[in-house]
Amino acid sequence: MMNVIEGILNTTLGVVFTWVGWKTYKILWKYTPYSYPNARVRAMEAKLLTEQRFNELAESRTLQNFVASLEDTDYKETLSNVSSYSVEEIERALDASLAKTYELMFKILPKRSRDFFRLMMEEWDVRNIANVVKAKLANEPASDYIIELGPMLPKVKAMAEAKTLEEILVILEGTPYEGPYQELIAGNIDVSTFETELYRMYYKKLLNYARSRKDDEKTLLTEFIKLKIDKLNLMTTLRGKLAGLSAKEIRSMLIPGGSLDVEPLLHIDSIEMTLAQLDSTEYGEFIRKVREEAEKDISVIERAFDEHLIKKVTEFDRFHPLSIAAPLAYVLKKEREVRKLRAMVKLIGDGLEPEVIKEFVGEVA
């Protein structure tokens, strides 16, 4: 009898220890790989430019002074190559610095997470390809519309140098964008539909990736992407209304996969009533705060959405400090910082007064 009891106890203990070992392994596998990268990310976040620093930069007066004022920041490396101090050259240097941020994420993050940042970089490919094609069709210098980011940047630059639309097709051969571009030059779709199709493909790819993740990471990434889609669809709707487009025309430019039901908004005539309709949505709280200003300038909504996006990811990071949330929040803040610096470069280049620059850049998110 004792042997039987001992056997049962041993078996039970074996099962318990196996279960504990498995749970411990899962916890270590899930959280430990983020310990070093997230500690490094938090150190980098402490170096982001403060509002006081932006105010000091606004006093630069010249682009040479602006560049010199950033010598003690992370931008020093890319700005050190600036020689002509033109707006375009400095913008390229700032973009290069942002690209290095993404590259760093590839290096320090766990292998299972770094692919998401690679996918995020592909959005710059979509923007660049759409911008170059639109510029070519409008007979404008395409290189002026390129942002120096994205895995396909060499191909994008080659597209800008192409002499004919057919040359661009050869450059895009074998890429996901070849099919939509073929449809465009064949006359089956217009350039607006072409651009929409690029974004639909991109966000479908992002959502598929997010849904393939597990647990907290799946929750965060799925919500993050849905927020980005909602922002894009809402801005498309508002801009479409301002341009006098019909509900059918706006609907054809929307991206599937978001949480916001845009359909009721399509049948409202005025911007004011459209914004009021958003009160009952999950975005009502932050849109109410800027509604009056947004009725005069809808870009206010875009900036408010970007801030909301950062806030949501930062909140997730607070509850899940050893997750992809910390690096994602940092990249979003870095993108915002670069947008502000780019805006400041243009304003200084145009010779605007420091007080005007401070006011304008304070509104840029």
Curated annotation (Swiss-Prot):
Record GO biological process: proton motive force-driven plasma membrane ATP synthesis
Q: What is its main location?
A: membrane
One Pfam family it belongs to: vATP-synt_AC39
User: Does this UniProt record's set of keywords contain Membrane?
Assistant: yes
Q: Which InterPro entries match?
A: ATPase_csu/dsu_sf, ATPase_V0-cplx_csu, ATPase_V0-cplx_csu/dsu, V-ATPase_V0D/AC39_subunit, V-type_ATPase_csu/dsu, V-type_ATPase_csu/dsu_dom_3
- Where does this one sit in the cell? Cell membrane
SUPFAM superfamilies registered for this protein in UniProt: V-type ATP synthase subunit C
Keyword Membrane appears in the UniProt entry = yes
Coiled-coil annotated residue ranges, if any:
none
What GO terms are given for molecular function?
ATP binding; proton-transporting ATP synthase activity, rotational mechanism; proton-transporting ATPase activity, rotational mechanism
One cellular component term from this protein's GO annotations in UniProt: plasma membrane
Membrane-related topology note: Peripheral membrane protein
Write out the entry's keywords from A to Z.
ATP synthesis, Cell membrane, Hydrogen ion transport, Ion transport, Membrane, Transport
Instruction: Report the sequence similarity comment from the record.
Output: Belongs to the V-ATPase V0D/AC39 subunit family.
Query: What function does this protein fulfil?
Result: Component of the A-type ATP synthase that produces ATP from ADP in the presence of a proton gradient across the membrane.
Subunit structure of this entry? Has multiple subunits with at least A(3), B(3), C, D, E, F, H, I and proteolipid K(x).
Matches recorded under PANTHER family: V-TYPE ATP SYNTHASE SUBUNIT C (PTHR38682:SF1)
Q: What's the protein here called?
A: A-type ATP synthase subunit C
Q: Which organism is it from?
A: Thermococcus kodakarensis (strain ATCC BAA-918 / JCM 12380 / KOD1)
The primary gene name is atpC
